[in-house]
Protein backbone atom coordinates (compact mmCIF):
# COMPACT_ATOMS: atom_id res chain seq x y z
CA UNK A 1 0.00 0.00 0.00
CA UNK A 2 2.82 2.38 0.86
CA UNK A 3 4.25 1.90 -2.65
CA UNK A 4 0.89 2.88 -4.11
CA UNK A 5 0.63 5.95 -1.89
CA UNK A 6 4.11 7.10 -2.87
CA UNK A 7 3.10 6.94 -6.54
CA UNK A 8 -0.15 8.78 -5.90
CA UNK A 9 1.71 11.51 -4.02
CA UNK A 10 4.12 11.84 -6.95
CA UNK A 11 7.15 10.82 -4.90
CA UNK A 12 7.79 7.78 -7.11
CA UNK A 13 6.98 7.78 -10.85
CA UNK A 14 4.80 5.09 -12.40
CA UNK A 15 6.63 2.64 -14.61
CA UNK A 16 5.50 2.41 -18.23
CA UNK A 17 3.89 -0.95 -17.51
CA UNK A 18 2.01 0.47 -14.52
CA UNK A 19 0.87 3.52 -16.49
CA UNK A 20 -0.37 1.30 -19.31
CA UNK A 21 -2.29 -0.86 -16.81
CA UNK A 22 -3.92 2.19 -15.21
CA UNK A 23 -4.78 3.57 -18.66
CA UNK A 24 -6.41 0.32 -19.72
CA UNK A 25 -8.36 -0.25 -16.50
CA UNK A 26 -9.58 3.32 -16.00
CA UNK A 27 -9.87 4.39 -19.64
CA UNK A 28 -7.38 7.24 -19.23
CA UNK A 29 -5.68 8.46 -22.41
CA UNK A 30 -1.92 8.65 -21.94
CA UNK A 31 -1.66 10.62 -25.19
CA UNK A 32 -3.88 13.37 -23.79
CA UNK A 33 -1.98 13.47 -20.51
CA UNK A 34 1.31 13.85 -22.37
CA UNK A 35 -0.24 16.44 -24.67
CA UNK A 36 -1.18 18.60 -21.72
CA UNK A 37 2.42 18.60 -20.52
CA UNK A 38 4.06 19.10 -23.91
CA UNK A 39 2.12 21.72 -25.80
CA UNK A 40 4.67 21.93 -28.61
CA UNK A 41 4.16 18.29 -29.57
CA UNK A 42 1.88 17.40 -32.46
CA UNK A 43 -0.90 15.16 -31.18
CA UNK A 44 -2.74 12.82 -33.56
CA UNK A 45 -6.16 11.25 -33.14
CA UNK A 46 -6.86 8.08 -35.11
CA UNK A 47 -10.58 8.19 -35.89
CA UNK A 48 -10.78 4.50 -36.75
CA UNK A 49 -14.08 2.64 -36.92
CA UNK A 50 -13.97 -0.36 -34.58
CA UNK A 51 -14.92 -3.51 -36.48
CA UNK A 52 -16.33 -5.07 -33.27
CA UNK A 53 -19.07 -2.42 -33.21
CA UNK A 54 -18.77 -0.49 -36.49
CA UNK A 55 -22.09 1.34 -36.32
CA UNK A 56 -21.55 2.72 -32.82
CA UNK A 57 -17.96 3.83 -33.39
CA UNK A 58 -18.86 5.35 -36.78
CA UNK A 59 -21.70 7.23 -35.09
CA UNK A 60 -19.39 8.53 -32.35
CA UNK A 61 -16.89 9.84 -34.92
CA UNK A 62 -19.60 11.69 -36.86
CA UNK A 63 -21.23 13.00 -33.69
CA UNK A 64 -17.91 14.44 -32.54
CA UNK A 65 -17.59 16.36 -35.82
CA UNK A 66 -21.22 17.51 -35.63
CA UNK A 67 -20.62 19.01 -32.18
CA UNK A 68 -17.55 20.79 -33.52
CA UNK A 69 -19.22 22.16 -36.67
CA UNK A 70 -22.25 23.25 -34.65
CA UNK A 71 -20.05 25.84 -32.93
CA UNK A 72 -19.02 27.46 -36.23
CA UNK A 73 -22.29 29.16 -37.19
CA UNK A 74 -21.35 32.34 -35.33
CA UNK A 75 -17.66 32.22 -36.28
CA UNK A 76 -17.15 34.66 -39.20
CA UNK A 77 -13.62 33.38 -39.79
CA UNK A 78 -14.35 29.65 -40.02
CA UNK A 79 -12.90 28.09 -43.16
CA UNK A 80 -12.53 24.62 -44.63
CA UNK A 81 -10.12 23.52 -47.32
CA UNK A 82 -10.01 20.02 -48.76
CA UNK A 83 -8.22 18.26 -51.61
CA UNK A 84 -10.12 15.06 -52.39
CA UNK A 85 -9.97 11.95 -54.52
CA UNK A 86 -13.51 11.07 -53.38
CA UNK A 87 -16.69 13.10 -53.03
CA UNK A 88 -16.43 14.89 -49.65
CA UNK A 89 -18.62 13.84 -46.74
CA UNK A 90 -19.95 17.38 -46.49
CA UNK A 91 -21.69 16.77 -49.82
CA UNK A 92 -22.66 13.11 -50.02
CA UNK A 93 -23.79 12.40 -46.43
CA UNK A 94 -27.15 14.09 -47.03
CA UNK A 95 -27.92 11.38 -49.61
CA UNK A 96 -28.84 8.18 -47.79
CA UNK A 97 -27.83 5.65 -50.46
CA UNK A 98 -24.50 7.31 -51.26
CA UNK A 99 -23.70 7.48 -47.55
CA UNK A 100 -24.76 3.86 -47.10
CA UNK A 101 -22.59 2.77 -50.02
CA UNK A 102 -19.47 4.34 -48.50
CA UNK A 103 -20.06 2.45 -45.25
CA UNK A 104 -20.90 -0.72 -47.16
CA UNK A 105 -17.64 -0.53 -49.10
CA UNK A 106 -15.65 -0.19 -45.88
CA UNK A 107 -17.39 -3.24 -44.41
CA UNK A 108 -16.66 -5.24 -47.55
CA UNK A 109 -12.96 -4.33 -47.39
CA UNK A 110 -12.67 -5.26 -43.71
CA UNK A 111 -11.95 -8.96 -43.38
CA UNK A 112 -13.27 -9.01 -39.80
CA UNK A 113 -16.80 -8.08 -40.87
CA UNK A 114 -19.03 -10.50 -42.73
CA UNK A 115 -20.35 -8.35 -45.54
CA UNK A 116 -24.01 -8.62 -46.51
CA UNK A 117 -25.78 -7.79 -49.73
CA UNK A 118 -26.21 -4.02 -50.04
CA UNK A 119 -29.98 -4.23 -49.70
CA UNK A 120 -29.66 -6.34 -46.54
CA UNK A 121 -27.46 -3.82 -44.75
CA UNK A 122 -29.63 -1.88 -42.31
CA UNK A 123 -28.25 1.47 -41.19
CA UNK A 124 -29.46 2.54 -37.71
CA UNK A 125 -31.69 5.61 -37.77
CA UNK A 126 -29.41 7.53 -35.42
CA UNK A 127 -26.58 7.22 -37.97
CA UNK A 128 -28.85 8.50 -40.74
CA UNK A 129 -29.81 11.43 -38.52
CA UNK A 130 -26.24 12.35 -37.58
CA UNK A 131 -25.18 12.12 -41.25
CA UNK A 132 -27.94 14.56 -42.17
CA UNK A 133 -26.87 16.88 -39.34
CA UNK A 134 -23.23 16.72 -40.48
CA UNK A 135 -24.10 17.66 -44.07
CA UNK A 136 -26.50 20.44 -43.07
CA UNK A 137 -24.26 22.03 -40.44
CA UNK A 138 -21.22 21.99 -42.75
CA UNK A 139 -22.94 24.70 -44.81
CA UNK A 140 -22.51 27.03 -41.82
CA UNK A 141 -18.75 27.13 -42.43
CA UNK A 142 -18.17 30.64 -43.74
CA UNK A 143 -15.68 29.77 -46.47
CA UNK A 144 -15.07 26.40 -48.15
CA UNK A 145 -12.46 25.57 -50.78
CA UNK A 146 -12.73 22.25 -52.65
CA UNK A 147 -9.90 20.91 -54.82
CA UNK A 148 -10.97 17.69 -56.51
CA UNK A 149 -9.20 14.93 -58.35
CA UNK A 150 -10.53 14.89 -61.92
CA UNK A 151 -11.47 11.22 -61.37
CA UNK A 152 -13.55 11.92 -58.26
CA UNK A 153 -16.83 10.75 -59.81
CA UNK A 154 -15.30 7.98 -61.90
CA UNK A 155 -13.81 6.37 -58.78
CA UNK A 156 -17.29 6.12 -57.25
CA UNK A 157 -18.92 4.89 -60.46
CA UNK A 158 -16.29 2.16 -60.85
CA UNK A 159 -16.86 1.04 -57.25
CA UNK A 160 -20.62 0.85 -57.73
CA UNK A 161 -20.21 -1.09 -60.96
CA UNK A 162 -17.82 -3.53 -59.28
CA UNK A 163 -20.32 -4.41 -56.55
CA UNK A 164 -23.02 -4.75 -59.18
CA UNK A 165 -20.81 -7.14 -61.18
CA UNK A 166 -20.28 -9.40 -58.15
CA UNK A 167 -24.02 -9.31 -57.42
CA UNK A 168 -23.88 -7.49 -54.10
CA UNK A 169 -25.94 -4.62 -55.52
CA UNK A 170 -29.05 -5.26 -57.60
CA UNK A 171 -29.71 -3.49 -60.90
CA UNK A 172 -32.67 -1.71 -59.34
CA UNK A 173 -30.59 -0.44 -56.42
CA UNK A 174 -27.79 0.59 -58.77
CA UNK A 175 -30.31 2.74 -60.62
CA UNK A 176 -31.47 4.29 -57.34
CA UNK A 177 -27.89 5.15 -56.40
CA UNK A 178 -27.39 6.62 -59.87
CA UNK A 179 -30.42 8.88 -59.37
CA UNK A 180 -28.99 10.13 -56.07
CA UNK A 181 -25.65 10.78 -57.73
CA UNK A 182 -27.34 12.77 -60.51
CA UNK A 183 -29.18 14.77 -57.86
CA UNK A 184 -25.86 15.46 -56.16
CA UNK A 185 -24.33 16.72 -59.42
CA UNK A 186 -27.31 19.07 -59.88
CA UNK A 187 -26.69 20.44 -56.39
CA UNK A 188 -23.00 20.89 -57.16
CA UNK A 189 -23.80 22.71 -60.39
CA UNK A 190 -26.01 25.12 -58.46
CA UNK A 191 -23.31 25.72 -55.83
CA UNK A 192 -20.65 26.23 -58.51
CA UNK A 193 -22.81 28.76 -60.36
CA UNK A 194 -23.68 30.76 -57.23
CA UNK A 195 -20.39 30.26 -55.41
CA UNK A 196 -22.38 30.06 -52.20
CA UNK A 197 -24.26 27.62 -49.98
CA UNK A 198 -27.97 27.96 -49.22
CA UNK A 199 -26.90 29.88 -46.10
CA UNK A 200 -24.97 32.42 -48.18
CA UNK A 201 -21.48 31.24 -47.27
CA UNK A 202 -18.68 31.16 -49.87
CA UNK A 203 -17.76 27.96 -51.75
CA UNK A 204 -14.93 27.66 -54.28
CA UNK A 205 -14.49 24.53 -56.42
CA UNK A 206 -11.39 23.64 -58.44
CA UNK A 207 -10.89 20.44 -60.45
CA UNK A 208 -7.25 19.36 -60.60
CA UNK A 209 -5.69 17.48 -63.51
CA UNK A 210 -3.30 15.84 -61.05
CA UNK A 211 -4.64 12.75 -59.30
CA UNK A 212 -4.52 12.66 -55.50
CA UNK A 213 -3.37 9.64 -53.51
CA UNK A 214 -5.53 10.55 -50.50
CA UNK A 215 -7.94 13.17 -49.19
CA UNK A 216 -6.54 16.00 -47.08
CA UNK A 217 -8.63 18.56 -45.18
CA UNK A 218 -7.94 21.61 -43.05
CA UNK A 219 -10.45 23.37 -40.79
CA UNK A 220 -9.66 26.70 -39.14
CA UNK A 221 -11.71 28.69 -36.65
CA UNK A 222 -11.04 31.52 -34.22
CA UNK A 223 -10.24 28.94 -31.56
CA UNK A 224 -8.51 26.06 -33.33
CA UNK A 225 -6.88 24.55 -36.40
CA UNK A 226 -7.63 20.96 -37.40
CA UNK A 227 -5.95 18.86 -40.10
CA UNK A 228 -7.33 15.54 -41.36
CA UNK A 229 -6.09 12.81 -43.68
CA UNK A 230 -8.58 10.21 -44.85
CA UNK A 231 -7.31 6.67 -44.37
CA UNK A 232 -8.95 3.39 -45.31
CA UNK A 233 -12.25 4.56 -46.79
CA UNK A 234 -14.16 6.18 -43.87
CA UNK A 235 -11.43 6.56 -41.25
CA UNK A 236 -9.24 9.59 -40.65
CA UNK A 237 -6.05 10.75 -38.98
CA UNK A 238 -6.64 14.05 -37.19
CA UNK A 239 -4.27 16.54 -35.61
Label each PLM-derived region with a short phrase.
Residues 2-5, 12, 90-101, 113-131:
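Charged, low-complexity, helix/coiled-coil-prone segments
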Residues 35-36, 50-56, 94-99, 189-190, ...:
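Short, charged low-complexity intrinsically disordered segments located at boundaries
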Amino acid sequence: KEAVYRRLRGEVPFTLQEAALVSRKLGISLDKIIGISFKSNAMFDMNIVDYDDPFESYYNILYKYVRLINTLEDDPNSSLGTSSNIIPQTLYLKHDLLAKFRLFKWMYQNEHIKCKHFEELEIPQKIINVQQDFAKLSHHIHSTDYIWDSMVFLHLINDIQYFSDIHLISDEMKQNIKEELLKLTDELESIAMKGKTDFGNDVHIYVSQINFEATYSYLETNLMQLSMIRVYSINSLTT
